[in-house]
Amino acid sequence: MSLFVDTSVWYAAADSSDTGNARAKAVLNSDEPLFTTDHVLVETWTLLRYRIHRHAAERFWEGLRSGTSTIEPVGTADLEAAWQIGLSYRDQDFSLVDRTSFAVMQRLGIERAASFDDDFAVFRFGPRRRHAFVIVG
């Protein structure tokens, strides 16, 4: 099974003072194939850069470059799907990165998400929006 990793888990694993640090590290050290998007990479790098230090951001990126996770590019079709998600969930404040993550996960058939972000638990997909992601972490 594949596991999509959200910014919240990448960040928590890099920040030793984060309350989710141990859980995040445990998830990332599992034997499951990990996936993330280029948008999550940029969002995480930016958070690490400004909240911790540039060195933390570079270590994170270096880890991804070394194969820690498959980095899936967000394409034009994913952006359109993300737009449609926004239209369908007007009552939610999903970020653009979350919406593109949902779109990529659906495209790749990934139903498991490592996230501390409640939006991943709220989002529903499939016919009549009956399916939810399995949240790990």
Give the residues covered by each predicted segment.
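Acidic, PIN/NYN-like endoribonuclease modules and their adjacent C-terminal/linker elements
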Residues: 102, 106-137
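Short, well-structured N-terminal submotif of metal-dependent ribonuclease cores
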Residues: 1-36, 49-62, 129
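A generic structural signal for short hydrophobic patches within well-formed alpha-helices
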Residues: 10-11, 41, 120-121
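Short active-site oxyanion
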Residues: 30-34, 68-70, 109-111
